[in-house]
Amino acid sequence: MPTTQKTLMFLSGFLTSLGSVVVICSILATQAWITSRIFFTDAISNGTIVITYGLFRGTSAQELNEGLQDLDKNFEVLGILDNSSQKSLHLVVILLLILSLAASVLSSVFTFYNSISNPYQTFLGPMGVYTWNGLSASFVFLAMVLFVGNAESNHLSDKLSQKLYPDTTNKRTTHTYGYSFWLTLHVIFLNIVTAVIIIFYQKARYRQKQEQRKPVEYAPRDGILF
């Protein structure tokens, strides 16, 4: 059976891993990843299109300086994108977050298993915990970078705007990233905290082993028998 110290520390790691699972699920479910303001003109009006969307769903509205305003629209991100580079990169972002979710789930399983067992010298021990947390953080970071690249350089918001309002001409676009996007940093933070907890446990375990292996010369001697 594991010691009380090990149980408590790995349960702490389990809670932080479980926290990252919950955060990733929130990231996938919410649609406040980005809000884009697209300044446009068409034959009879001009103004701003405001698009807010996440990985799967979004909303759009017009703020006109003059002309007849369209009704607000709800849309499916993947549903209105054709087979384009924007859609391909968006799918990669979703895939990376799903992989990060799977890695965080495995980290939760490994930390909980270590809190009730002693698979220390195998991959099921701390090495497995480090691996899954490292992969989870890496996948999330790549998803962040690709999403920003798709929005800024690959003009994802402009593509969505053209599909929603085909008769408009886009002039300029600005982006504001929402809480769903910034939650990805919390996932990386929780992955780091989980790894740090296990590092502290390993250091404490190493110190205990060193104390148990004190040289014989420090032990009391009553005498030497010949």
Curated annotation (Swiss-Prot):
Gene3D superfamilies for this protein: 1.20.140.150
Q: What parts of the sequence cross the membrane?
A: 8-28, 92-112, 128-148, 181-201
- Which UniProt keywords are listed? Glycoprotein, Membrane, Transmembrane, Transmembrane helix
Q: Where in the cell is it found?
A: Membrane
Q: Name one GO cellular component term.
A: membrane
Attached carbohydrates are found at N46
Which InterPro entries does UniProt cross-reference here? Answer: Clarin
Its BP terms in the Gene Ontology are: sensory perception of sound
Q: How is this protein positioned relative to the membrane? A: Multi-pass membrane protein
Family statement drawn from the similarity comment of this UniProt entry: Belongs to the clarin family.
Q: What is this protein called?
A: Clarin-3
| The species this protein was found in | Mus musculus
